Amino acid sequence: MRNRYLDLLRAAATVRVVVYHSTGWAALTVVFPAMSVMFALAGSMMAASLDRYGPIAVERRLHRLLPSLWVLVAVAVPVMLLGGMAWDWKVLLWFFPVEDPPAEGFWLEGLAAMWYLRDFLWFVLLSPLALPLFRRFPLPTLLLPYGALVVITLSGATPHLVVRDLALYGGAWLLGFAHHDGLLSRDALVGRGGRFGRGGRPTRAGKPSVLARYRWWLVGVLGTTGAVWALTHPGPRGLDLNDIPLANALWSAAFILVALGVAPRIAGRRTLTVLNSRALTIYLWHVPLIIMVVRVAEATGLPVHGWVGITWRLAVVSVLLGIVVLLVGWVEDLAAGRRPTLVPGGSRRTVPVSPAPAGAVELARSAP
């Protein structure tokens, strides 16, 4: 059974990302740290997949992720090559972007959000090793990415972008593991030593995990520390957490502990189904559409900034996204093994069967 609350969080994160990239409002990164929430939700789903399918879960997850990317690549890469981009073997990375592939012209900005897929691929590939390690040593494993980020920040080191992002978002992914294993809820009891059986469930009843018992203390410490660091180390755009990695990680951890530490009952809504079934398509295409709308506005003299500019741009981007979702969103259905539909969540029609007359039933029984 689907967890509609997690669907709600994923849908809210998707909408928040589109609104943030359309408006640039830094406050949104504080009110709802969407990227960390998306990584945490993905980590929880990855742990569930590994428990159910084993290492083959990696292939299944990639199978759901890559086809939608290839649709965008089939448009962007030929356009860039025809526009004069030099051929290089790194262009092939667009089909499996474990490192940033080359981009030029319009697509240099339009594909800027591809870092999420790059990091997602790395987390998926590392999860078969990370999940057993997390279950054997939960707290040390969880502290590792945060400790690495502190060292990177305080030393001023400039590691490879993948290494930096594994430190920045690795904690969120591992908190997703913790959510799947029930470590964020006081209702889930963990045996001595935090031992887990098959499916990541506790092997014997004991007491709530450390994360559950001290959750509100951790929320206070992490949130306060993240806020203080952000206020004393603002980035080029002020308090935009995307520019302040350490504050981003700490504040996001506090947010995730609150958001995933509860499990309210959410009624099913078709809007949630559509947003979740098309979340990847929306993410992949929203930045190119935003860039396109902004360039058209600048070329025609239409307002870009202020409430008027933001309102009409957001409306146009939403309409264009709806069109793209109708055109190529069904690829997500194929990748997930579902029957492709234009708009997910529709009820299946069944043909009512009228009861046969009693006489016909008796006649059928007496037939040879």
Residue ranges and their predicted role:
Residues M1-P368:
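Alpha-helical transmembrane segments and their immediate juxtamembrane cytosolic regions
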